[in-house]
Amino acid sequence: CGTESNNMIIKSCVEHLGVERIITSPLEHKCVAETCLEMRAKKGIELVCLKPDNKGVLDLAELEKILQSSDKKTLVSLMHANNEIGNLLDIDKVSEICKQNNALFHSDTVQTVAHLELNFAKTLVDFASCSAHKFHGPKGVGFAFVRKSSGLKGLIVGGTQERNLRAGTENVCGIVGLGKALEIFTKNMKEYTAHIQGIKDYAISELTKAIPHIKFNGNSTDSEKSLYTILSVSLPFKNPLIGLQLDMKGIAISQGSACSSGASKPSMVLMSILT
């Protein structure tokens, strides 16, 4: 799955590739954030966080400046699309910056595989992550894209399965399910995108009319800068029952990310752009 993929890539970069510094952001998925913190605590790596603006946009000039400030071997870990506010990162530009500064680049592409056209022959990320359930494949299965020249090694040993990157008997039915779901989604990508983008545009229009002072978080209203599957809003009132009330009307919303379900603390992503 995406979580295991992100863990493996980041930990192996530190343990096997000699990475001494990780540049990331407070917008990352919890599995990336906590893995980076663990590597700082256990391995003593330097951890640098880019500060997003109030729209959740990262300053790539600042990234370049930080990369040029040290000769430490560096991994940049920045997600392609944020799972809470939907902001898209220009991973082609980040790849270019990383290559120019001899840094490794990992992108959590869990939200965008099968939803956007990705070509890793052209977009020169070193590592990327995918999870099948994001395109209606089976839960608990995903993949890690690893550039052959990277030298990355697996963390689970004892067998040569999965190109020596993950020992153990393969989850064949999960892998086949992932492949079939990916095939179906990519074949119908344009149709699916147009349909869901239409629903998102309608929701933005109707919410704006119905709720004065509603706030759309990140770049939610800009289809060029936001993933079509995600719409994040801040309401100008408090209603702890709103999730239940909308569910009774047949409308599903999320009041937090799945990785933080049940948590009483506010979203780290929203805190980083709203405070």
What are these regions (language model features)?
Residues 1-275:
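Pyridoxal 5′-phosphate
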